Curated annotation (Swiss-Prot):
GO biological process: translation
Similarity annotation: Belongs to the universal ribosomal protein uL16 family.
Annotated Gene Ontology cellular component terms: cytosolic large ribosomal subunit
Protein name: Large ribosomal subunit protein uL16
Listed PANTHER family: 50S/60S RIBOSOMAL PROTEIN L16 (PTHR12220), LARGE RIBOSOMAL SUBUNIT PROTEIN UL16M (PTHR12220:SF13)
Length: 151
């Protein structure tokens, strides 16, 4: 599972997720990408499950890039513990994902195999996703901004 080797601080505040992803919102390495359509936290276990789903479907062909990294620690206090006594210990790590973020990329396989592999990976993730090609990514950013402004 993915987690940072070392961090400056052990614990982090929750924060708020709003707006679109302006970084990592285009297919940079592969031919096909899996784009998040809504904001969420994605745990390292979910990232690993999605990665396994992709590699299992494409077998030995193709190359997979994971474009998100779980660098936010989530703390949890033990069960049946009274309030207070400080912040709990780190339980797991998550990646903060905003709408428009490319989470996985795939290259070296046919289009139908890539779409099915990324669709299977999307089923393992807690966000609505869309499979995009390198060619259609230019129009996606403008579509995303237009749809969010109308709501």
């Amino acid at each position: 599972m993915l987690l940072p080797k070392r961090t400056k601080y052990r614990k982090m505040q929750k924060g708020r997720s709003h707006g679109l992803s302006y970084r990592g919102n285009s297919v940079a390495f592969g031919e096909y990408g899996l784009m998040a359509l809504e904001p969420s936290w994605i745990s390292s276990r979910q990232i690993e499950a999605a990665r396994r789903a992709i590699t299992n479907y494409v077998k030995r062909g193709g190359k997979v890039w994971i474009r998100i990294f779980p660098d936010k620690p989530i703390t949890r206090k033990p069960a049946e513990t009274r309030m207070g006594g400080g912040k709990g210990s780190v339980d797991h790590w998550v990646a903060v994902v905003k709408p428009g973020r490319i989470m996985f990329e795939l290259a070296g396989v046919r289009e139908d195999i890539a779409h099915e592999a990324l669709r299977r990976a999307a089923q393992k993730l807690p966000v609505k996703c869309k499979v995009i090609d390198r060619e259609e990514q230019g129009t996606m950013a403008t579509d995303q901004e237009v749809s969010s402004e109308s709501e």
